[in-house]
UniProtKB/Swiss-Prot annotation:
GO biological process, one term: prolyl-tRNA aminoacylation
Highest taxon of source: Bacteria
Role summary: Catalyzes the attachment of proline to tRNA(Pro) in a two-step reaction: proline is first activated by ATP to form Pro-AMP and then transferred to the acceptor end of tRNA(Pro). As ProRS can inadvertently accommodate and process non-cognate amino acids such as alanine and cysteine, to avoid such errors it has two additional distinct editing activities against alanine. One activity is designated as 'pretransfer' editing and involves the tRNA(Pro)-independent hydrolysis of activated Ala-AMP.
Keyword field contains Electron transport: no
HAMAP family: Pro_tRNA_synth_type1
Entry GO terms, CC: cytosol
Complex and partners: Homodimer.
Keywords (A to Z) from UniProt: Aminoacyl-tRNA synthetase, ATP-binding, Cytoplasm, Ligase, Nucleotide-binding, Protein biosynthesis
Lineage, broadest ranks: Bacteria, Bacillati, Bacillota, Clostridia, Peptostreptococcales
UniProt name for this protein: Proline--tRNA ligase 1
Enzyme superclass (EC): ligase
Entry comment, domain topic: Consists of three domains: the N-terminal catalytic domain, the editing domain and the C-terminal anticodon-binding domain.
Disulfide bond keyword on record: no
UniProt-annotated location(s): Cytoplasm
Length: 571
């Protein structure tokens, strides 16, 4: 491609609304153009990158015998009502009606659509296993679009769905997709970590996220310093404290005027917060929920809502509800005698002795409370992991980092097949629900994550596998016919080899050309300048500072060597 004919609106200045590096560089390099909040047009340079990521995805999934289809983006509400997600998806779903008042949505995801296809066609175990995928635009009415293509209202996703006869088959499908994802992200040049994750509104028993460590990541990820344990903070667990052996003391009610928070109580009683139990009151679809954690801990609301199951609305209770549940003002709730639909007790509380709890009485607390003797509830892990907690696998300290999710895989089980009657006849002639998995990758988000990992002060440093073009040829002087002629010969030779080449034939200063090539991140640059008098050109790799002067005859082999080094096919 000759740059004089290319639509590539680059910018020198950083856009005012671009908060993170990938957003800034995507806009500045002419990859994307904002249409409105959360909606971006993809320009030629960006589209080439996105299509290359899609092609890598296709190649790796096809190796696993997955088959590509394309579902409609406009989906009838009936399918979502069957699965129970028409309401559960909440305000993120774009809903609309046609002229006959029939309800539809713009697909935010496609579990229902794929299940509908399969239930109409699959009747026997002989037709399974099966794995279908698509690369399709999704629509989600994000409350706060941000970070460029990281969080938008429309985005491209590869979503795949596996269909098996039993859990053993699902385990194999899940592992195949896990392995495919590792290969996909490796080929994209992404350093990533698979981590245990919460399944969220999609549902299912097991899921893993593929996370890219990044300071601008919206997710917190827990990593062990001593083993391979890694989990999203929503799912992460840590070891409990060792059981305390001291004898249980008698309950003692204490007047604590003005001490309605842990900090105030800590100062009033001169006791550390790990000696307190913090009792929080929530509402879940009209039910009252009480959660008790140690005073220096935070409640993990995802774990609590998962313990309840199928929760649509989950939030801290209003002051009026707290007063009704505790018969006291806010700040004095405790687990002893509390009146709630659910009472959840974090496992750490069970191991503690003689803790301080709210008395459910305004301006009073109770000392020496003990689980089992004084209060009970549903015991489980309902707290957030903190930096330095001990790993549940090896006992070493845990670390917390921010990350960007680029892929997510789920074991759905029979969640959708049961609700939508997607059944098959097994070897014994019995009807059984198909066992499913689903697997997603965000295409534009993957590109943004690559930029977050591969950039410098000059611009993007694309890995060769996903670069919009492999080589840029820069004639130093557009008034020098010999330079132009040699540049065009190199351009034609490399194209004939299957190399994707940019020829910067613009009538611009060489500094402008260099700046643009570095901004857009082309992996290799060949400069045709004064050295042609000696039959030589300048060769430079984007990720290195040094330059080489090489013979023109060496160019083809030099470029080939980079493809081999990066394990990228030519042509």
């Amino acid at each position: 491609m000759k740059m004089s004919k290319m639509f590539m609106p680059t910018l020198k200045e950083i856009p005012a609304d671009a908060e993170i590096t990938s957003h800034q560089l995507m806009v500045r390099s002419g990859m994307i153009k904002k249409m409105t909040s959360g909606v971006y047009n993809q320009l030629p340079m960006g589209l080439r990158v996105f299509k290359k990521i899609e092609q890598i995805i296709r190649e790796e999934l096809n190796k696993k015998d997955c088959q590509e289809i394309l579902c409609a983006a406009l989906l009838p509400s009936e399918l979502w009502k069957e699965s129970g997600r028409w309401t559960a998806m909440g305000e993120e779903m774009f809903r609309l009606k046609d002229r006959t008042e029939r309800e539809y949505c713009l697909g935010p995801t496609h579990e229902e659509a794929f299940t509908d296809i399969i239930r109409q066609e699959i009747t026997s175990y002989k037709q399974l296993p099966l794995n279908l995928y698509q690369i399709q635009v999704k629509y989600r009415d994000e409350r706060r679009p941000r970070f460029g293509v990281m969080r938008t209202k429309t985005f491209t996703m590869k979503d795949a769905y596996s269909f098996d006869v039993d859990d053993k088959g699902l385990d194999k499908s899940y592992q195949d997709m896990f392995d495919a994802y590792v290969s996909i992200f490796d080929r994209c040049g992404l350093e990533n970590s698979p981590v245990q994750a919460d399944s969220g509104a999609i549902g299912g028993s097991t899921s893993a996220e593929f996370m890219v460590k990044s300071e601008v990541g919206e997710d917190e990820v827990v990593f062990c310093s001593g083993c391979d344990y890694a989990a999203n903070v929503e799912r992460a667990e840590s070891c409990n404290l060792a059981s305390q052996k001291e004898e249980m003391k008698e309950l003692e009610e204490v007047h604590t005027p003005g001490a309605a928070t842990i900090k105030e109580l800590e100062e009033f009683l001169k006791t550390s917060p790990d000696k307190f139990a913090k009792t929080l009151v929530y509402e879940a679809d009209g039910k009252t929920v009480v959660v008790v954690v140690r005073g220096d801990r935070e409640v993990n609301e995802i774990k609590v809502s998962n313990a309840i199951g199928s929760v649509i609305e989950f939030a801290l209770a209003t002051d009026d509800v707290v007063r009704k549940v505790t018969n006291a003002e806010v700040g004095f709730a405790g687990p002893i005698g509390i009146n709630a639909d659910y009472v959840f007790i974090d496992k750490e509380i069970v191991e503690q002795r003689n803790i301080v709890v709210g008395a459910n009485k305004t301006e009073y607390h109770i000392k020496n409370a003990n689980y089992g003797r004084d209060f009970e509830g549903i015991v489980g892990d309902f707290r957030n992991v903190q930096e330095g907690d001990k790993c549940i696998v090896c006992g070493k300290p845990l670390e917390i980092a921010r990350g960007v999710e680029v892929g997510h895989i789920f074991k759905l089980g029979t969640k959708y097949s049961e609700s939508m009657n997607a059944n098959f006849i097994d070897k014994d002639g019995k009807s059984k629900p198909i066992v499913m998995g689903c697997y997603g990758i965000g295409v534009e988000r993957t590109a943004a994550a690559i930029i977050e990992q591969h950039n410098d002060e000059k611009g993007i440093i694309w890995p060769l596998s996903v670069a919009p073009y492999h080589v840029v040829i820069v004639p130093a002087n557009m008034k020098n016919e010999e330079q132009i002629s040699i540049a065009e010969n190199i351009y034609n030779d490399l194209q004939a080899m299957g190399v994707e080449v940019l020829l910067d034939d613009r009538d611009e200063r060489i500094g402008v050309k260099f700046n643009d090539s570095e901004l857009i991140g082309i992996p290799m640059r060949i400069t045709v300048g004064k050295n042609i008098n000696e039959g030589k050109v300048e060769f430079k790799l984007r990720h290195k500072e040094d330059k080489e002067i090489i013979d023109i005859e060496e160019i083809n082999e030099k470029v080939k060597a980079e493809f081999i080094r990066n394990n990228v096919r030519l042509g």
